[in-house]
Amino acid sequence: MAGQTVIVSGLNPAAILQSTIGGAPVAAAAENGHTRKVVPLSKDALQDFMVSIITQKLQDDKQPFYVLDLGEVVSLMEQWNSALPNIRPFYAVKCNPEPSFLSMLSAMGSNFDCASRAEIEYVLSHGISPDRIVFANPCKPESDIIFAEKIGVNLTTYDSEDEVYKIRKHHPKCELLLRIKPMTDGNARCPMGPKYGALPEEIEPLLRTAQAARLTVSGVSFHIGSGDADSNAYLGAIAAAKQVFETAAQLGMPKMTVLDIGGGFTSGHQFTTAAPAVKSALETHFHDFPELTIIAEPGRFFAETAFTLATTIIGKRVRGELKEYWINDGLYGSMNCVLYDHATVTATPLACMSNRNNLNCGGSKTFPSTVFGPTCDALDTVLRDYQLPELQVNDWLIFPNMGAYTKAAGSNFNGFNTSAIVTHLAYAYPN
């Protein structure tokens, strides 16, 4: 099946497409009336697929590109449903809003966490209904609240009295989730606690404020922070959430029915340790809430490993043993994750021009290397003292695990347009 092009399309961007490959569903939505091509591959053929894309490029078209492995997305959803079957994912759109990726997640049952009017409009444009959206931003512009009321997004978060007043004025039928601050951020790469979440002493006053405003507080939300967080952080946060449920009951408020455990999940070892801890904590603290709806806001769990970035070497300089390379994406583009998401990127050579018989330069001597991005800012340095074989201009560097907070947060600085980077679709089967 490898190399065969399968064209799939749907009536709208959220349609579950009926094409199958080897019995496995392939979902990729029609975008703005255009079909997308999905290439089925064996798991170890992704590199060959990338080489085929590079080979088909014109001599003057060496722009970076992504490959989205839809097979990886299916695998991750299967892992989620197996490990946390009673927790409904609301994918964090901010992490990566690539259209076919969102359509795939939607087709597999994911709902969506949006933080702005623009994100809500984007999700709705894919045919996804507003009742599948949580407006998970505790501090929203009044204009966004008015928009949410107009189109029927009726679940949001809050952690301040002023937010209650805005919602009471503009969207009184909206159900609220009280965002609380976890006791620990679990050593997350991107902690959320300094900015969001009610402190313990603020919880009862905030519940009373919502009660006085005649708003419905349906439950509690928290976020332990993004990226590699210690799974034990979920334990304390879930226990604290239960205390909020009890406080609301003591105040005579309607019984809470929703618990939002936020994000912070990373695929791999962190998830395999976090999922049992979450299940255990929920059983301990919420076993007497059989009708409880539990949701989560995973972003990088689904996005990070599903995307691979290919970049061209556009410049080279040799200083003794040190090899310096310039590539056509960098810290002002996809690699902004190095600065803002505290990510560590890795690179694999693809010597399409200089060594076609040994694309990965296996067995070749390696040298300490620096990889710069394309802009004129010296800060735009992707890798330092990184071991690479000697490469040439027009060779390529491949960056795996580039789906989380990459293209979505890139800029157009110096005229390098991150948003213009094309994404190719593949469906890789496990070996």
Curated annotation (Swiss-Prot):
Major enzyme class: lyase
Residues that coordinate or bind pyridoxal 5'-phosphate: S226, G264, E297, P298, G299, R300, Y405
Activity regulation information from UniProt: Inhibited by antizyme (AZ) in response to polyamine levels. AZ inhibits the assembly of the functional homodimer by binding to ODC monomers and targeting them for ubiquitin-independent proteolytic destruction by the 26S proteasome.
Record: residues binding substrate: Y340, D341, D377
Protein keywords: Decarboxylase, Lyase, Polyamine biosynthesis, Pyridoxal phosphate
Protein EC: 4.1.1.17
Biological processes annotated in GO: putrescine biosynthetic process from arginine, via ornithine
Pfam families: Orn_Arg_deC_N (PF02784), Orn_DAP_Arg_deC (PF00278)
Gene Ontology cellular component terms for the protein in this record: cytoplasm
Active site (catalytic residues): C376
Expressing tissues: High expression in roots, shoot tips and whole flowers at anthesis. Lower expression in stems and the lowest in adult leaves.
Domain of life assignment: Eukaryota
GO MF annotation terms: ornithine decarboxylase activity
Catalytic function, reaction form: L-ornithine + H(+) = putrescine + CO2
Protein purpose: Catalyzes the first and rate-limiting step of polyamine biosynthesis that converts ornithine into putrescine, which is the precursor for the polyamines, spermidine and spermine. Polyamines are essential for cell proliferation and are implicated in cellular processes, ranging from DNA replication to apoptosis.
PANTHER family: ARGININE/DIAMINOPIMELATE/ORNITHINE DECARBOXYLASE (PTHR11482), ORNITHINE DECARBOXYLASE 1-RELATED (PTHR11482:SF6)
Family: Belongs to the Orn/Lys/Arg decarboxylase class-II family.
Protein name per its UniProtKB record: Ornithine decarboxylase
